[in-house]
Amino acid sequence: MSAGDVHVTGGPASAPADDAAYEDSEQGYAAGLRAWDGLPGIPASSGALIRDSRGRILVLKPTYKSGWTIPGGVMEANGETPWEACQREVFEETGLRVSAGRLAAVDTRPAKARRAMGLRFLFDCGVVTDEQAASITLQSTELSDHAFLAPSEALARLRPAVSRRVAAVLETGGCRYLEDGRPVAGVPDE
């Protein structure tokens, strides 16, 4: 290393040379907790893009807010991953079990008055059979209706931020990084 170069490791100057071993040690774990303690949390949620055999998108009508949305919801603070949240929410809301999905987008929702910044993960969970589509059982405390709609009709019915997110994914088919549902200059698609 030449003068002016900096090498940052996961622990203090007295940490072992093996960063992974340090992070797994009690000392490293405690140091990690102290480093994160007091930092603000960022709310995160996961959603599922689910289609039927005719390419129509599954949309849901919530009882607790206006407009339509896609299956999904908030990640639990118990260590749940975005994919686990997607699977859990789809099952809770529709009775469908999704076992495969592709990360389609990560969307940063900007902070607004009385609302913190948030992260939204969108997974493309593929196509359900006609039998699976017919078996959907809605979570009645949160949802009043569902429909499979042609993409253009689904985009028109979805809440604006969700519509932008889904449209961005449908546009490229790759994984997208978005901010408020919009592509970001300088961040190429997958």
Model-derived features with residue positions:
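Conserved Nudix-box catalytic region and its N-terminal flanking loop in Nudix hydrolases
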Residues: 52-92
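Conserved beta-strand and immediately adjacent loop positions that scaffold enzyme active sites
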Residues: 47, 56, 145
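Acidic, metal-coordinating catalytic segment for phosphate/diphosphate chemistry
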Residues: 2-47
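Nudix hydrolase/Nudix homology domain
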Residues: 2-9, 66-68, 140-190
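Conserved beta-strand residues within beta-sheet cores
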Residues: 45-47, 97-100
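Unchanged
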Residues: 75-99, 107-162
